[in-house]
Curated annotation (Swiss-Prot):
It is found in: Mitochondrion matrix; Mitochondrion matrix, Mitochondrion nucleoid. Belongs to the TEFM family. Keywords: Mitochondrion, Mitochondrion nucleoid, Transcription, Transcription regulation, Transit peptide. Transcription elongation factor which increases mitochondrial RNA polymerase processivity. Regulates transcription of the mitochondrial genome, including genes important for the oxidative phosphorylation machinery. Gene3D superfamilies: Ribonuclease H-like superfamily/Ribonuclease H (3.30.420.10). One of its GO terms (cellular component) is mitochondrial matrix. This is Transcription elongation factor, mitochondrial. It holds the Pfam family HHH_3. One of its GO terms (biological process) is positive regulation of mitochondrial transcription. Disruption phenotype: Morphants show reduced movement and have abnormal neuromuscular junction morphology compared to wild-type animals. It comes from Danio rerio (Zebrafish). The keyword ATP-binding does not apply.
C-alpha cells in the first residue's frame, strides 16, 4: 500500500507528465501531437481523393494531354482513315466494326447528328459508352479489319459460344441454319441463310411440357411433331440454357430444359461418316446475350426491343442487319410488344441466336 501511494504521489506532484507540471517550451503536449498527426492524415486523404476524381471534373489539362497522346498514336493518314469511317459510315456499317455493335453505333450516329463530324480522335471519347481503351480497339479494328480473322483460322474457340468443336471452315460453308429455343411450354425455331435472310420463323405449343406427371413418351411425341416441320439445313443450333444448379427453385425448369435439349440432339442427329462435322450444335445463351448487350450482371434481359428494331430496319433501310420477308413482318409485328412479351420470347431468342451465329463467324 505504501509503495502504491509513493508512486502516485510522485507522478502527480513531480513527474515529467504530472498533472500540475508545465511542459518545457521546446516540447509539445501529447494531445497536440495527436492533433497534428490527425490533421496530416486528414489532409493527405483529401488530396488523394481529389487526385482520384481529377479525370472527371478538375483537370482539363490532363484531358488535353490524353487527347494529344491518343492522336499521336496514329499517323496523319491513319487518323484520316479512322475519322472518314466514323464520320460517313451508316449505323449498319458501323456495326461491322469490332465493339461498335448495338448501342455504341447508335450513339455515334446521334453524336454526329447533334455535334457535327468528329474533328479529332479525342472527340470520339465524348460518345457515350466509348472510353479510351475501347476507342483504341475500335481504331485498330478500322485500320486492320482482317487481323482477327487471320488469327482465328482453323477451329473456333467453341468454349466461347458453340459446342462441340467444329472446324471453322465447315461453319463458314453453311448456307443455312435452324436456330431452336425451348421454353416451359413451347419450342420456337428460325430458319436463316448466310445472308441473314429469315426463311421461316415459327413456334409450337407442347401440351406435355411441365404438366402433370412426366412421361418420356409424351415429350417425345410433342418434340417429334415440332421437328417434323423443319426444312433442310446445314446445322441445327440448340440454345444451351444458363440456369445455375445452385438456384434450387428453378431446378424443375432446368431438368425440363435439359430433357428437351437431349431429345432434340437425339432426334436431329444423323449417322455421319468419320471426319464429318456434327449437325446439331449448342450455342450458349449468355454468349448471345453479351453479343447484343442484353446482360445485366449475370442475368440476361429481354431482346424484344432489339428484335423490333431489326424488323423496323428491314422495312426502312436499304441494307438492314437482318432481312425479314414482308409477310413475316406483318404476321409478327405485334408479337413482341411489352404487353405480349411472354407470348413471343422464345421466338425472339431463336432469331437473335441465329443472327449472333452468323455475325460471330464474321469476327
Amino acid at each position: 500500500m505504501w509503495i502504491v501511494k509513493g508512486i502516485l504521489s510522485s507522478v502527480v506532484l513531480k513527474g515529467h507528465y504530472s498533472l500540475f507540471s508545465r511542459p518545457p517550451p521546446s516540447s509539445l503536449p501529447d494531445y497536440a501531437l495527436r492533433f497534428l498527426h490527425f490533421t496530416c492524415c486528414r489532409s493527405s486523404k483529401i488530396m488523394f481523393s481529389e487526385f482520384d476524381s481529377s479525370n472527371a471534373s478538375i483537370s482539363p489539362e490532363l484531358r488535353q494531354e490524353n487527347a494529344k497522346a491518343l492522336d499521336s498514336c496514329y499517323t496523319e493518314e491513319q487518323r484520316a482513315v479512322i475519322l472518314q469511317r466514323l464520320n460517313t459510315a451508316t449505323e449498319s456499317e458501323l456495326e461491322q466494326v469490332k465493339l461498335l455493335r448495338g448501342r455504341k453505333s447508335v450513339n455515334i450516329v446521334k453524336y454526329r447528328t447533334r455535334h457535327g463530324p468528329f474533328s479529332s480522335l479525342e472527340s470520339v471519347i465524348n460518345v457515350p459508352l466509348l472510353k479510351y481503351k475501347s476507342a483504341i480497339m475500335v481504331f485498330d479494328s478500322i485500320l486492320n479489319p482482317d487481323n482477327k480473322r487471320k488469327r482465328n483460322k482453323g477451329k473456333v474457340h467453341l468454349a466461347k459460344f458453340i459446342k462441340p468443336d467444329v472446324n471453322r471452315a465447315h461453319l463458314e460453308d453453311a448456307s443455312s441454319i435452324i436456330s431452336i429455343v425451348c421454353g416451359t411450354n413451347k419450342i420456337a425455331w428460325a430458319h436463316m441463310d448466310r445472308a441473314r435472310t429469315v426463311l421461316d420463323w415459327q413456334q409450337a405449343e407442347c401440351q406435355s411440357f411441365m404438366k402433370g406427371t412426366y412421361l418420356a413418351s409424351d415429350y417425345l411425341e410433342d418434340i417429334s411433331s415440332v421437328i417434323s416441320s423443319f426444312p433442310a439445313a446445314d446445322f441445327f443450333l440448340v440454345e444451351k440454357p444458363s440456369i445455375s444448379p445452385q438456384n434450387t427453385s428453378l431446378f424443375p425448369v432446368m431438368v425440363h430444359l435439359r430433357t428437351v435439349e437431349a431429345m432434340l440432339f437425339a432426334l436431329l442427329s444423323q449417322a455421319r461418316e468419320p471426319g464429318s462435322p456434327p449437325k446439331v450444335l449448342n450455342m450458349m445463351r449468355i454468349s448471345v446475350g453479351r453479343h447484343f448487350d442484353l446482360m445485366v450482371g449475370d442475368c440476361r434481359t429481354s431482346g424484344a426491343e432489339t428484335l423490333r428494331k431489326m424488323m423496323t430496319d428491314s422495312v426502312m433501310k436499304r441494307d438492314p442487319r437482318v432481312l425479314f420477308p414482308h409477310d413475316l413482318v406483318l404476321k409478327h409485328r405485334n408479337s413482341f410488344q411489352m404487353s405480349s412479351r411472354n407470348k413471343g420470347e422464345e421466338m425472339c431468342d431463336a432469331l437473335l441466336q441465329a443472327v449472333a451465329f452468323f455475325e460471330l463467324l464474321q469476327e
